[in-house]
């Protein structure tokens, strides 16, 4: 399924008609597949989006990593709703900072995290990217699903990397080899905050057989 997606993307790029916005949409489709799920086409009923489960490779990698952390608190960043469903199945007791989590509930989650009572915290970077103080305990950030936005990427990490943090922050990227995950990482490393950088990174990724391999 992923190979078919990438073949279609390559044809579109070679046509010269792909804009930065088109590239962002295409990358999101490829990223879903790499993560282990995908939204199905809209059935026209107006119901909530239907998803299909594809694999658990990333989820299993996260489980292994959390085990290696030996109880060190970690915050896991996710993107899509079906990412969260897989992570909830893997970590059923983990609290979630995401859409609709506000007020006293959010305050309670933050207090427990900073008190060291939460071994695994699931968070959407857009919900936990600004204003939250999470530096009281854990120093491990796990990106289950990368964002191409440098601002969102940096702000999410800075929730832990703030005054009062006593440890070095360690950032782990769960990446599917030979997928758009690598293009997204290229975009982040270029430290360019414009959407055009993603399109450029996707083009370089498609031509990866002729460019130097980058270690992450």
Where are the model-predicted features located?
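A short beta-strand element within the Helicase C-terminal
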Residues: 133-146, 170-173
